[in-house]
Each structure stands twice: as C-alpha cells, then as structure tokens.
C-alpha cells in the first residue's frame, strides 16, 4: 500500500477507535478532536517506526533532522504521519456517534501506552524511543486518564 506494509494501516485502524473515544471525551470541537487524536496516533508511531526499521521494513538514505535517541527516523517522517493522523482523526470525527461503553477502548489505549514504553525501554533497549514516545503520548494520555477517573461516565 504505497510502500507501507499492510500491517501499519491495520494497526492504525485498531488504534483509531480507542483514540477517538478518548479524544472525543476530551475535546470540545471537531477540530480540537482532530488535532488531539492526530497527535496521539502520530506519537504512537514514535514507537512503531523504530521497530519497523529494526525489522528491515524501511530505512532512509537522507535522515536530515532526527530526535536524539531515535537516530534512524527522520523528523519529516513523524511530521508526515502527524498530518495524516490529523486528517484521519478529522474524518473519523465526522462519522455519526452513538453512546458506547468505553471500558474496552480505554483499557486497550492504556495497555498500548504502558506496554510500548516498557517494551521500548526494557525489551528493545531503546531508551530514547521510550522517552520520546512516552512523553509525546503522555501529553494526551495523562490528562485523559485524569478526565476518565475524575469524571466517570456511567
């Protein structure tokens, strides 16, 4: 799919639902939802790309500017995914909403966050990935966790 392994769109599809459930609960407008949801999806990619490079799925000849601790991924890759994620989140936010129990998507989102930080740091020895991904996702995850615990929807 345009040089992207099919696993990536499948993973993003799996992640899109819990991200949208979380960001729709946090944001007041569709545009805010798109930016917050886009940030959360793209920051998750900070964990994915180093794994994909490590598995040999892709590499860049001209890295340009990179984040310290993530030397194999050019920053323009993150920016491209960020724009794609904002567009995707905006489009998904246009779909009709219906009331749904958010326990499963909430659990999935927390599990993905925690497991990616732990896996990057301890299993793959990628401390920079754990820090950048953990901080970037944490900018949304921690306020969202505060929101769901302080304002439960029953």
Question: Would you name each region that the model predicts?
Answer:
Residues 1-154:
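Aromatic-rich, lipid-facing transmembrane alpha helices and their immediate juxtamembrane interface loops
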């Amino acid at each position: 799919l345009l040089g992207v392994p099919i696993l990536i769109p499948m993973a993003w599809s799996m992640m899109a639902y819990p991200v949208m459930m979380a960001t729709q609960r946090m944001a007041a407008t569709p545009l805010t939802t798109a930016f917050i949801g886009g940030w959360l999806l793209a920051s998750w990619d900070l964990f994915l790309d180093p794994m994909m490079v490590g598995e040999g799925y892709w590499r860049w000849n001209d890295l340009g500017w990179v984040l310290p601790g993530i030397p194999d991924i050019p920053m323009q890759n993150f920016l491209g995914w960020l724009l794609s994620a904002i567009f995707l989140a905006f489009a998904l936010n246009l779909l009709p909403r219906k009331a749904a129990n958010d326990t499963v998507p909430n659990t999935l989102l927390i599990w993905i966050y925690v497991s990616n930080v732990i896996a990057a740091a301890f299993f793959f020895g990628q401390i920079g990935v754990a820090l950048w991904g953990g901080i970037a996702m944490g900018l949304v995850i921690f306020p969202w966790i505060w929101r769901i615990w302080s304002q439960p929807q029953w």
